UniProtKB/Swiss-Prot annotation:
One of its GO terms (molecular function) is structural constituent of ribosome. PANTHER family: 40S RIBOSOMAL PROTEIN S3A. PROSITE patterns: RIBOSOMAL_S3AE. This is Small ribosomal subunit protein eS1. Keywords: Acetylation, Cytoplasm, Ribonucleoprotein, Ribosomal protein. InterPro entries: Ribosomal_eS1, Ribosomal_eS1_CS, Ribosomal_eS1_euk. One of its GO terms (biological process) is translation. It comes from Penicillium rubens (strain ATCC 28089 / DSM 1075 / NRRL 1951 / Wisconsin 54-1255) (Penicillium chrysogenum). It is found in: Cytoplasm. Residues 1-18 have a biased composition (Basic residues). HAMAP family: Ribosomal_eS1_euk (MF_03122). The keyword GTP-binding does not apply.
Amino acid sequence: MAVGKNKRLSKGKKGIKKRTVDPFTRKDEYSVKAPSTFQTRDVGKTLVNRTSGLKNANDSLKGRIFEVSLADLQNDEDHAFRKVKLRVDEIQGKNCLTNFHGLDFTTDKLRSLVRKWQSLIEANITVKTTDDYLLRLFAIAFTKRRPNQIKKTTYARSSQIRAIRKKMTEIIQREASTCTLSQLTHKLIPEVIGREIEKSTQGIYPLQNVHIRKVKLLKSPKFDLGALLALHGESATDDKGQKVEREFKETVLESV
C-alpha cells in the first residue's frame, strides 16, 4: 500500500463558516464642528478606526474634507443651491475642528441659470487674503433686458463683455485681498460681491444672477492652532490661573 496523504481525511467539513467580526466595533465616533462664521456649528458625526499601536485616530481624521449644504449651516433654505467644503485641521477630545476649504454651486442650479437670448459672462481670478490663503474665485453673470426694451434678445457686444469681465476681476480682487479668510466667508454667504458687481456694471450692460459660483483653495499658510481656536470661538490661553494677591509685609531696615 502506497504511503501518502489521505485526501478524504484531510478535507474539512463543508458549510462551516469563519466567524465574522463587525468592523464597527473597532471604530469611534467624532463630532464635526463648523467655524463660528456659520450659524449651525454641529455638522454631523464621522467614524474612524480606534487608535491601536502606531496608527493614531487623530492622524486619520486630520485632512478629511466634508461637503455640507449652506442651507444646513445657515438654517435658511434660500442657500440650498450652495455647497461648502470644510477641512478638519485639529482634534480636541471627540470634536473635529474644521476650517473653510471651498465653495461650489449644485449642478441643477447652474443648469437652471443658463437660458436662451442672453449672454453668459464668466471671470476667474487668483487672490491672496491678508492671512496668506491663496484662493481662486470664479464669478458668473448673465445679461438682462433694459427698462422698456422691446427686443427679445439681450446679447452684449464683445467689447462690453470684456469691460464687464475687467470690472468683475477688479471688484473681486479689491474685496478678497483686503480681508482674512473668515471675513471673506462672511461676504460670500450674503452674496455681497455679486451685488457689488451688478451695481457697478449697470452703465456697461444690465446684469442679473451675478454670483461667485466657486471658491477653490489653492494654498494654505502654516498651521496656526491659536487662529483656528479663535475661529471656533475658543482660546488657547484659557488654562491660565488667576493672579494671587500676596499679603502685605513690612520692610525691615538693616540700619537706621
